[in-house]
Amino acid sequence: MGKGPLSFRRLSSIRHRKKGSAVKDDSAQTSTPSSPPPPLPIHAGGSAVGATGKAKKKTGGARLWMRFDRTGAMEVVECDKSTIIKRASVPARDLRILGPVFSHSSNILAREKAIVVNLEVIKAIVTAEEVLLLDPLRPEVLPFVERLKQQFPQRNGNENALQASANVQSPLDPEAAEGLQSELPFEFQVLEIALEVVCSFVDKSVAALETEAWPVLDELTKNVSTENLEYVRSLKSNLTRLLARVQKVRDELEHLLDDNEDMADLYLTRKWIQNQQTEAILAGTASNSIALPAHNTSNLHRLTSNRSASMVTSNTEEDDVEDLEMLLEAYFMQLDGMRNKILTVREYIDDTEDYVNIQLDNQRNELIQLQLTLTIASFAIAAETLLASLFGMNIPCPLYSIHGVFGYFVWSVTALCIVLFMVTLGYARWKKLLGS
């Protein structure tokens, strides 16, 4: 009996404690969707930090990433795949696409909350609030980082706090949602910068290839040598690799342009706004259903569901994929122009090879004609040698006893061989075996 009141007080204090923690959890959950995502849970060394403050051991698959959000805040960290998967809500196979095995492939993949971008040297995961860039310190990636800094200048803490408070107070304001959709979304701005950097990088490579190609090909037409042929061979191999790179990026853009559903899936900001509107409507429905009678609750649910469906359909029908389609078409035409330049250089290389082959065929024909002429001359000389050998035998002959017949015999045999040579040569030209 002495422990009764004490136990009752203890239970009541526990209940009060649970209610207070539940209120805190509810407030934390309501403020989470509208606030920007927290920084990556990693320190400068790259390993995760636990609740006790002790750093865990660095995992073997940690790589260098850069986090850049829409407010211009930037941090370079080193983290493993699991951290990125939880942060961006992407499957593990998408991180394999960003790995070294698929370094020469080009992909733009739409996921529920992120876009996986693998374009040449740019490997990133783009969400509606931030971009996670892999290996940001590479020299080829630095122009992309600089363009991000120019496009999204860093704001001070007061501006970020005001924006966060405005989002918390009115996260579902229709005018604010319309303003977000009127300007180009954050993910499309990042995608545009990535395509711009890739096109600029490829354009420089194409210009360098053209500058190197024309003098080498002109020199080859004048002088067919082993050194010039080696230059053209290396030039053609570089051209083939560059054409394959441009073709991969162009094919990826063409694949997106051919499928409106894939382009619609890239609208991360639109999906985020629709989710916020739906959550607000459901929250309003729940609050109103508490005050209304039971027979009016079903009607209210029906009206709110129709309203949410109409808002979602209106948002998706409005400017469906026009902005993204115009963006992709611009860079698709630019890549197509680069591809045409490369094909022009390759056609010129093919024409030069044909010209060199014609020259070599002509020289080969001249050598064959010379060989045939020498063969005819050898035949005539062989006939003269045959006559000389016949009369050089040690056999009785009446011509041996005639004085001074040797000179006439030699000159007559020589003249006969010359006539034989001219007749055979004329016959070969008559049959068009030799040029005129």
Swiss-Prot record:
GO molecular function: magnesium ion transmembrane transporter activity
Pfam families, alphabetized: CorA (PF01544), MRS2-like (PF22099)
Low complexity compositional bias, start-end: 44-53
Entry-linked SUPFAM superfamilies: Magnesium transport protein CorA, transmembrane region
Alphabetically ordered keywords of this record: Ion transport, Magnesium, Membrane, Transmembrane, Transmembrane helix, Transport
Keyword Transport applies: yes
Subcellular localization, as worded in the UniProt entry: Membrane
Cellular component GO terms, alphabetical: membrane
Major localization class: membrane
CDD domains given in the database record: Mrs2_Mfm1p-like
Tissues where the protein occurs: Expressed in the whole plant except roots.
Cross-referenced Gene3D superfamilies: 2.40.128.330, Magnesium transport protein CorA, transmembrane region
Ranges annotated as biased composition (Basic residues): 12-21
Motif annotated as Required for magnesium transport activity, chain positions: 392-394
Membrane topology category: Multi-pass membrane protein
Chain intervals for the UniProt region annotation (Disordered): 1-56
Keyword Transferase: no
Listed transmembrane segments: 372-392, 405-425
Physiological role: Magnesium transporter that may mediate the influx of magnesium.
Family per record: Belongs to the CorA metal ion transporter (MIT) (TC 1.A.35.5) family.
Note: Has the ability to complement a mutant in yeast lacking magnesium transport capability.
Protein name: Magnesium transporter MRS2-4
Lineage: Eukaryota, Viridiplantae, Streptophyta, Embryophyta, Tracheophyta
